[in-house]
Every structure is written in structure tokens, then in C-alpha cells.
Amino acid sequence: IGGGFNAIEHKEAIKSFIETHTNTAIIFATARYAREYLDVNAPHFYCLVGNEGHRLTHNINPQNLSGICVLPPYPRPMGTEVPEYAKNVTFELENITFIDQYKDSVTTIALQLAILLTDQDIYLVGYDGYPGNVLSEKEMALTNENRTIFATYTTISGKILKSLTPSIYKEIEVVSV
């Protein structure tokens, strides 16, 4: 689950999809909408890179944390903030196997974890992209980063990532939730 608004806009349909597809895990590339999915009966994983630990603290109370936090492999150039209450459920990925760039990206961490968890289809939610012709420098950099990550995943795995919510990324296939 990425940080795009479609993760909220379509959350009931997404929850229904998860309930009907047993053996599904939820991997939060960002904790932005983690609170919205606490009631879903599926394993929860939270990618912690940079300030995502702070965002997790803001969105999930210690008593509501029922998942696993995942860190990128060491060294971590962006650093990582792990909330005190999550330290005993935090694990570090051994390595990133599908891409040589963007190893500290939350999207890379989420995809690597998904690769470790399944050999089936991987579904994305909330990777809306940034519409419009005028993007900020940060939006353009993130767009290019995600496009590279998605394309590399497809090249390495031979599979196309599927999005359950609308997305402007041409590197992924949008399927109806």
C-alpha cells in the first residue's frame, strides 16, 4: 500500500479483495494509511525507512500494532527511526535481490518483502502517480524512482505488477478491484 489517495478512496473494495483472497499479506510502503487497515484480518508489514517510524507512531498506537516492521539491509543511507514500542517486532532484510538502485526506497523494500513472501501475483494499492504536466522536483524524482523499480521488477521476474486502484504508471497493469 503506497501513499496515494486511492488507497483511501477504494479502501472498502480493497478490504473486500483481501478478505476473499486468503493468504494475502498487507505491506505498507508508507504508514500514512496504516490506521485505515487495522481491522483487516491479514498479516501486516510496515516498511521503515527514513521518517516512516515517526509516521507509524503518528498513525498506530502501541497497543494496536499487530504487525512486523521491516528495515532495509545495512547500511541505511537514509537512516531509520524505529519506534520504541516496535523494536521487538522489527527485522532487517538480508539483501535486495531484484534491483541495484534505490535500495533504501520504501517501494523497493516493500517489493523485496513481497518477493520473499510469495511467488504469486503482487498487487499494488495507492500508487496513483502524480497527474498533471507540472511536477515538483520531489514528485518527478519519486515518479522516476517508482517507474525504474516497477520496470526492473518486471524485467527480473517476468511478471507485471498489478494495481487494484487507478494509477498513471504505465509500468504496472491496472485491474479492477
Question: Residue ranges of each PLM-predicted region?
Answer:
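Metal-ion/cofactor- or nucleotide/acyl-coenzyme-handling active-site neighborhoods
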Residues: I1-V177
